[in-house]
Amino acid sequence: MRAYCVTSESVTEGHPDKVCDQISDGILDACLAQDPAARVAVETLVSGNTVFIAGEITTTARLDAVRTAREVIEDIGYADPALGFDSGSCFILTNLRTQSPDIDLGVSRGAELGAGDQGVLYGYACDETASLMPAPIHMAHGLSLRLAAARHGGVLPWLRPDGKTQVTVRYDGEGRPEALTSVIVSTQHDEGVDRETLVRGIIEAVIYPEVGGWLKPETRVLINPTGRFVIGGPAGDTGVTGRKLMVDTYGGCARHGGGAFSGKDSTKVDRTAAYMARYAAKNVVAAGLARRCEVALAYAIGERLPEMVSVETFGTETIDVDRLTAAVRETFPFSVSGMIAALDLRRPIFRKTAAYGHFGRENKGFQWEKTDRVDALRAVCGL
C-alpha cells in the first residue's frame, strides 16, 4: 500500500447547519421527555434572523416548539442582536403535522416495531485513536471543541459562535497515521480584534493544546485564511438540518447511506441502525478481531429485521470474516425494537449528539460508544 492523505472537517455548534440540527434534536428531546414513544421527524431552516421549523410529530407531549428553539439558540450563544441572529428577536415559523397514517401502518406492528423507512446504514471503527475513531475527524472535532470551550469559558472573549476546523493527516504504507500536514481554523470574531491577537489566541488556546504534538515545521497552519470572519452564523449563511453528514459521522473515512440523523426518533433506522452499526463495529475492534471494521445494515419500510448485515474489515481481521460476520449477527440485536431497547433510545439524549459528532464521544453516556459486548463477541467467536 502506498502512503496517502485524508482530510476531515468539523464545525462548531454555532455553524448554521448545526444550529438547525440542535433545534431539531431539541424538539425531539422535548417530546421524549414527556412521551418516550413520540414519533418525531422535524426539519429546521435558519436564514438571517428567521427560523422555519417543519415536520411531522405524533405525541401526547405538550410541546412548545418555539420556546424550545429559542432556548437552544440562546444556549449556543446567539443572544446578542449585534450578531444579526439572536434568540430574543428571531422570527420563528412552524408547520408541524402528525405522522402520515401510511407510515404508521408499517411502523406500528404489534409488539415488534417495523422500520420507519428503507435505508442503508454504516457504522465504522478503527484503532487509530483511543475512542476508536479515525484520526482526522478526531482531531478536527477536538479543535472545534477547543474553540467552543475558549468562547464559553471567556478565554478568548472576542470569539463568536460560528467556526470551522479542518485537518489533513498523512498515512504510511501500512495505513497508520504518521503526520499532520495541514491544520485550518476559521472562527467568527468580534469586529475590534486585531489579527495578531486572533492568531496568537487560536494557536495558544486551540491548536497547541489539541494537536501540538503533531505539529512539525512543515505543517501548514491556516487561521482565518480570508483575514476576516465577523459576519457569521445564520446572518451570513442559510442553514438546514442534516447537511453535515461527514461531520456527524467519520469525516469521510467510511461510507454513508445518505440519511441524516437529527430530528428523527428511534423508529427511523437512518439514526438507530447507524448507531447500532457503530456499536457493533467498535466492539469488533475493541475485541481485537480487526484493526478496522465497517458494519453495513439495510432495511425495508415496515420490516422489523434487516435485509442485510455485512461486515468489512479491509484485510485487518484476525479471524475468518465469515465467522466474524456470524458472530456479529449473534451478538447484536438488529431488529428495530431490539436496537431501540439495547441502545436505550427512548431517552431525551439527542440534542447532545447534534454538535461535535455522534460518534467517538465517550463522556456523553451514549450506549453505542460502550465496548461492553467484547467478551460476548469473543466467546461467540470461540476465543
Swiss-Prot record:
Q: Reply yes or no: does the keyword Magnesium apply.
A: yes
| Residues bound to Mg(2+) | 17
Q: What are the binding positions for K(+) in this chain?
A: 43
From the record, what ranges are coiled-coil? none
Q: Which reaction does it catalyse?
A: L-methionine + ATP + H2O = S-adenosyl-L-methionine + phosphate + diphosphate
Keywords, alphabetical: ATP-binding, Cytoplasm, Magnesium, Metal-binding, Nucleotide-binding, One-carbon metabolism, Potassium, Transferase
Required cofactor(s)? Mg(2+); K(+)
State a GO cellular component annotated for this protein: cytoplasm
Q: State where the protein is found.
A: Cytoplasm
Residues that hold ATP according to the record: 15, 162-164, 228-229, 237, 243-244, 260, 264
- InterPro entries referenced in this protein's UniProt entry, alphabetically: ADOMET_SYNTHASE_CS, S-AdoMet_synt_C, S-AdoMet_synt_central, S-AdoMet_synt_N, S-AdoMet_synthetase, S-AdoMet_synthetase_sfam
Cofactor binding: number and manner: Binds 2 divalent ions per subunit.
Instruction: Supply one GO BP term.
Output: one-carbon metabolic process
Task: Give the pathway annotation.
Answer: Amino-acid biosynthesis; S-adenosyl-L-methionine biosynthesis; S-adenosyl-L-methionine from L-methionine: step 1/1
User: Can you tell me which residues bind L-methionine?
Assistant: 56, 99, 237, 268
Q: Which GO terms describe its molecular function?
A: ATP binding; magnesium ion binding; methionine adenosyltransferase activity
Region: Flexible loop, residue numbers: 99-109
Q: Identify the EC number(s).
A: 2.5.1.6
The cross-references to Pfam families, in alphabetical order and at most eight, read: S-AdoMet_synt_C, S-AdoMet_synt_M, S-AdoMet_synt_N
Q: HAMAP family under this entry?
A: S_AdoMet_synth1
Subunit info here reads: Homotetramer; dimer of dimers.
Family that this chain belongs to = Belongs to the AdoMet synthase family.
What role does this protein play? Catalyzes the formation of S-adenosylmethionine (AdoMet) from methionine and ATP. The overall synthetic reaction is composed of two sequential steps, AdoMet formation and the subsequent tripolyphosphate hydrolysis which occurs prior to release of AdoMet from the enzyme.
| Full protein name | S-adenosylmethionine synthase 1
Q: What is the lineage of its organism?
A: Bacteria, Pseudomonadati, Pseudomonadota, Alphaproteobacteria, Rhodospirillales
